[in-house]
Amino acid sequence: MEYAAIHHQPFSTDAYSYDGRTVHIKIRTKKGDADHIRFIWGDPYEYNDGKWSANEQPMRKIAATEMHDYWFAEVVPPFRRLQYAFVVTDDHEDIFFGSSGVCPYNEKTLETIHYYFKFPFVHEADTFQAPEWVKSTVWYQIFPERFANGREDLSPKNALPWGSKDPDVNDFFGGDLQGIVDKLDYLEDLGVNGIYLTPIFSAPSNHKYDTLDYFSIDPHFGDPELFRTLVSQLHQRGMRIMLDAVFNHIGSASPQWQDVVKNGDQSRYKDWFHIHSFPVTDDNYDRFAFTADMPKLNTANPEVQKYLLDIALYWIREFDIDGWRLDVANEVDHVFWKTFRQAVSTEKPDVYILGEIWHSAEPWLRGDEFHAAMNYPFTEPMIEYFADQTISASRMAHRVNAHLMNGMKQANEVMFNLLDSHDTKRLLTRCRNDEKKARALLAFMFAQTGSPCIYYGTEIGLNGENDPLCRKCMVWEKEKQNQDMLQFMKRLIALRKQENTLLTEGHLEWNLLDDKNDFISFSRTLDEKILIYFFNQGNVVQHVSLRELNIDRNKKICDAWTEQPLQHHDVIAVQPGEFLILSAAAPV
């Protein structure tokens, strides 16, 4: 047994409160090392005849990567206090693993109380909690300038005819909020129930990430009453809306920055920014990346903090928005985000806080900052396997597992899963315009825990390279839309919503990772219900024998996509590039 590979970190995603009473425990071992692990636990104050009263239960192996196995236990301490350790067993020995590391497994070790990990008290206030509605939300991301032109009188004077060319960086086409209002029937029919808008506040650019005034709607998009109408109509349809907050930086045309440019170190706003010297030049202040027109805000400054918090609360109080997506969230200090979380959650307890973070987001997902991050690290291995074909099926599965093991279960359940956005190549382009691959990838992503999002136009086959080509105008002429893709997305979204509880909370198990033939199978299970997925990314037909799946004969099996009943002895062909979803459940 390789002792150095055994890892458990208390007070982390390895040991946390799931719901204010239940504690989730994980431990990692070298892959294939441990035969089984026993979890030893009890109340630190409970003794019987002078001996600590301990409970023992087996742990379940829930995931594996190329190097490690992950084991899981769930306990409900009756007095909310927990003292615990692990007994790891292989072919040759039992070892005790606790706060002092690896120890011999014997009576003396078991009775040495300071060798045990502690979870002093399970506080509900310390429990990561996210809005329940997010678990049942399918998001649709809209880049407002390119979605629909509902009022030509709002369009910039230099706006080009809608969809007349592929966009350049500085082009305008006249998309606005009225265009979104006009298309709500379309969005409802598609099945999405959450709308994420990139910035809508006053700004000179088409993307609006260079904010002029956070308290006003950009005049080319509309006005407060039009936005109020949009929010009201969304809520009437049972749909949610999330806005984009750019609090890392502000636009260089903003009055605050212009005051600094004009007045230098005499400006009342000089401490709002990270300025190295005066007067301001092109290279003596911090900005987003190296973008001169996006000076970075100093969020440690109390005036800046109040300004930004007032903005966040204003749009909640005045318009009842449901969420904030936070741009460049990883470059803003944790102290500010903790204050932000407290302020907005106090104002609206079920508001959703989403951070734009392109790497592991665990430091922001501990319950006192964000509810979720844009889950690029989770979906990137899926894209690399299905679209790029640069990694194997097993490598993809291992990376997916590693990402899930790095998070708390309730955080994974509300993560923002996406395959493309305004910052990436479009999905179809990433798939080299192979629609089968795009469909398989979407079906795969929609089968995972988390809140799925599609980027506007994906459902009708819109393609596009990186920015600005990923920000094309939406196509509204039906004859120019891919209607087969549209019907596919409607069915995929409907299936996700139908099986939402299972796909959000259910256990993921990989059944088959055939790297040679590019054939994958995994299952999602919750209670007595199971969905079994098969993806054939190879070049030959694969056959699935239902008899060999050993499904309980009391359960009814059907093709979850077509809802066609199946028999336990059926054999189903999965064509190259296609997928199969089986549903098995006890008869109602």
UniProtKB/Swiss-Prot annotation:
- Could you say which residues are annotated as the site Transition state stabilizer? 423
Q: Where in the cell is it found?
A: Cytoplasm
Question: Where does it primarily localize?
Answer: cytoplasm
Q: What class of enzyme is it?
A: hydrolase
Output the superkingdom of the source species.
Answer: Bacteria
Q: Which GO terms describe its biological process?
A: carbohydrate metabolic process
**Residues holding substrate:** 249, 325, 422-423, 467, 471
- Catalytic-site annotation from UniProt: 327 (nucleophile), 356 (proton donor)
Q: Which CDD domains match?
A: AmyAc_CMD (cd11338), E_set_CDase_PDE_N (cd02857)
Cofactor(s), by name = Ca(2+)
The free-text note explaining how the cofactor binds reads: Binds 1 Ca(2+) ion per subunit.
Q: Name one GO cellular component term.
A: cytoplasm
Among the GO molecular function terms of this UniProt record, one is:
hydrolase activity, hydrolyzing O-glycosyl compounds
Q: What EC identifiers does the entry list? A: 3.2.1.-
Recite the UniProt keywords alphabetically. Answer: Calcium, Carbohydrate metabolism, Cytoplasm, Glycosidase, Hydrolase, Metal-binding
Q: Which positions does UniProt annotate for Ca(2+) binding? A: 149, 155, 174, 176
Pfam families associated with the record = Alpha-amylase, Alpha-amylase_N
Q: How does it assemble?
A: Monomer or homodimer; in equilibrium.
Q: What does this protein do?
A: Hydrolyzes beta-cyclodextrin to maltose and glucose, soluble starch to maltose and glucose, and pullulan to panose with trace amounts of maltose and glucose. It is also able to hydrolyze acarbose. Can also exhibit a transglycosylation activity transferring glucose or maltose to another moiety of sugars by forming alpha-(1,6)- and alpha-(1,3)-glycosidic linkages upon the hydrolysis of substrate at concentrations of 5% or higher.
Give the family per the record: Belongs to the glycosyl hydrolase 13 family. BbmA subfamily.
**Protein name according to UniProt:** Intracellular maltogenic amylase
Q: What organism does the UniProt record list as the source?
A: Bacillus subtilis (strain 168)
